[in-house]
Amino acid sequence: LSPQNQLMDLHVREVFFTVNGWPVVSPERYAGTAPRSFTKEDLAGEWEIIRLQEPPLERSLEAGQIMWGEGDLRNGEQALSARVVLEADGSVGDATWDFNVKKQLLTIKTATEDINNLIIFAGHDWENETETILFTGLDAQGHSVWGKRIN
């Protein structure tokens, strides 16, 4: 854990498994939101998406822990979210999206990659204090991709 406690600690998160069997977690803390199914129309709207990447810098570790003085994020290390709009026509900027209603899985296709089988579920947006639609999954490199509908 970071000496300055910048990492998530003692947050309970819902765990899901991808179609390939990999565990992934909710982008938001667990709130006991009742499960439900969604339609493609439910997903259209403004989303906040974040992709978690490997840190570009090496860190000194002691027994798996970040050393004192190594806990501050440096330029380029912070994973920043982006706001995107999933349009009702299946477009998202220069990319496209599709939703498998039966399996409740989202796919986003860009010019350079396809992010497949993002798990859609109901959850709580703690920042905006409301129930919302969330997704979690992995990109082709195995990095987490999280999203929450914000409008």
Residue positions per predicted region:
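Carbohydrate-active catalytic/glycan-binding domains of CAZyme proteins
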Residues: L1-N151
